[in-house]
């Protein structure tokens, strides 16, 4: 199958784009619902530990599958055709079919950006096993980025499977000589450990000096997962890229937008973005800037 798709790169890119549009629609559900599910679980656990009454929750199950999506304004159930990625939003004019309330443009944006990122990966790696796994990594990084952006939270239920998939993929090497992905197990293991410990060490050093927390444990796990996928050789590139871009944007927001410097800014999106770029062009970046690692 991959051989047939490899013979028609444009077809593979088109299929990848269409597939990612559908997955992007589901990722919108993950981005919205998973933090709510986690909060409900935490509240129940806190009530159990405090031996108090469990918090009242809406009736019925609430997970990534049920209930079906509804309009947040009127509660009207979203029909199948209204879930068509991007197109349904355009056909409805960005408004609910029932109450005409405005629908956030973020939903089609997430769908389209997810598809665009996957299409770039398909173009870069082609119809190869390396390309398929790069798509998997991309689809994990999208909800990690958005949830951290919204909540300053990186769920273990996403980042830990990403870590273990990366370690598992290092045991499978169908393309000898392929660069970045399908690294040797020692490189993946060292990458995971070094990625976690590097930010963990910085966290405690920063806290010791300033008395403040500079980042969260989810950031450690995310860099560990990226190290498992890409190898320890690319950790320095990811750290430098994410730190420079994050610091530049943070300073710009403070200077030009008056952002309160005491308000924390999530670091996960910068790590995810740097990891994704490194996955595609890591060697070129290291060579251009003459990075030592």
Which ranges hold each PLM region?
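Functional transmembrane core segments of multi-pass inner-membrane proteins
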Residues: 4, 16, 130-245, 287-293
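Membrane-water interface of transmembrane alpha-helices
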Residues: 25-38, 80, 200-209
